[in-house]
UniProtKB/Swiss-Prot annotation:
GO terms for biological process: proteolysis; symbiont-mediated disruption of host cell-cell adhesion. Residues 1-38 form the signal peptide. InterPro entries: Glutamyl_endopeptidase, Peptidase_S1_PA, Peptidase_S1_PA_chymotrypsin, Peptidase_S1B, Peptidase_S1B_tx, V8_his_AS, V8_ser_AS. It comes from Staphylococcus aureus. This is Exfoliative toxin A. Keywords: Calcium, Hydrolase, Protease, Serine protease, Signal, Toxin, Virulence. Gene3D superfamilies: Trypsin-like serine proteases (2.40.10.10). Transmembrane segments: none annotated. Belongs to the peptidase S1B family. The gene is eta. Pfam families: Trypsin_2. Its cofactor is Ca(2+). The active site is at H110 (charge relay system), D158 (charge relay system), S233 (charge relay system). Disulfide bonds: none annotated.
Amino acid sequence: MNNSKIISKVLLSLSLFTVGASAFVIQDELMQKNHAKAEVSAEEIKKHEEKWNKYYGVNAFNLPKELFSKVDEKDRQKYPYNTIGNVFVKGQTSATGVLIGKNTVLTNRHIAKFANGDPSKVSFRPSINTDDNGNTETPYGEYEVKEILQEPFGAGVDLALIRLKPDQNGVSLGDKISPAKIGTSNDLKDGDKLELIGYPFDHKVNQMHRSEIELTTLSRGLRYYGFTVPGNSGSGIFNSNGELVGIHSSKVSHLDREHQINYGVGIGNYVKRIINEKNE
């Protein structure tokens, strides 16, 4: 058998493996490589570039406010923004999480992994804000973590649950603010516009921002256009009814290696069932 046939068989095997793997393992390098397609029509690339330029074509500070803007102090005290907080893993990373229960925060598995199973390394700071002068405000305090459920949805799903301790007065965070209302991603369709809320660390430290995102496909989870940077991992995705329908995960190759797209985990029936079972 010549080398070209051997290579073809190997590539076919890899493709079959990737198709059979979980749709949500978006951090996996092999999956990212397989998003890079060898043949993409000029029309597809043009459409993608137009969307990409709309959301990323200018400096973030110059994006229209309806596409990307800081959440002001007044709104940070309102739903759903007050359910959003900074997930801080000491000495490792800073990301985002969403309060979904009295003591439960939903974030990404790849963020929770940084703690190596040690809850003492993690804290949750809802509605934290650091102004441009470096002054930091934590209106609901800083919550220590009691338990990390790193893979409650399975190893292939980029979601994790963090269970919080009550504050020093014995008050749970969910007694101070209403947790996010859990919706479903089942009713979403291509072209829908949603709101992504989180803490884009690479843009501004400890400043909550909202982004308008536009779904481009529901294949292999949620894919969408919208301004995101590191720190947005774990950001909540909300529909127009204020229901949590997904969690932002990452940005990976899309049409080819030069074109990226945002990926998120939708809250479908399976995810919603596990949330209901594990929520506290």
